[in-house]
């Protein structure tokens, strides 16, 4: 029996209306699916439509034409929006825009109160969510005393407490320093290992390299789609789209040009190290004959 996708985007188009006679097209006939447990990265330069697309995935925005389905629910149905948003939670670029309470644990509980979770279960969910993001010791702190990475972890905890099937990260690390990014990526890695469905919108190619699948947008259309290895193999196309590739991918290609036996489709630093070690071992074996 074929598994149904958790999210299905079907021929979606969207435009921002400036006035009654003027609109700006942002998405054009976009179609893709996200399976349960999958980690999908959406990339594209500024203005490509990726953040607009992310907001389609839980009904914040609704298509002009086409449909978005979440666990069989159409986002056009306003009566289903609460269920859809419990299924697909969003974490945005600025955590301050998501934090509403003056104490960390109260902020985690806020969404649970709104959906009528009983107090005993609420306490359990808050405890579990704070533990999941490594913020249990900060539960009594005011959010404004936290670092950017810590605030973003609180925002993620607030979503996790709702027990969603999928989390959408819309440029969730773009405003953080390197340490804050590492904090969030560690949390994302943990969620992924536990089977959470993740959709991330990002311009950090090192994050994209960790995904199962990459969707590349240009002027509101999908122009590339595949595994990170398949997408990053197309260096020239990515350059034309004004997108970077991971440094590891650039280095692997350069070494391959100089030494064709070296694999060119490497996208992570650890893969480069292992390939270098493999060739060192081969040289030792040859010289020992």
Regions found by a protein language model. Give the residues of each.
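The feature captures the beta-strand-to-loop junction immediately N-terminal to the Walker
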Residues: 43-45
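Conserved ABC ATPase signature
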Residues: 142-146, 150
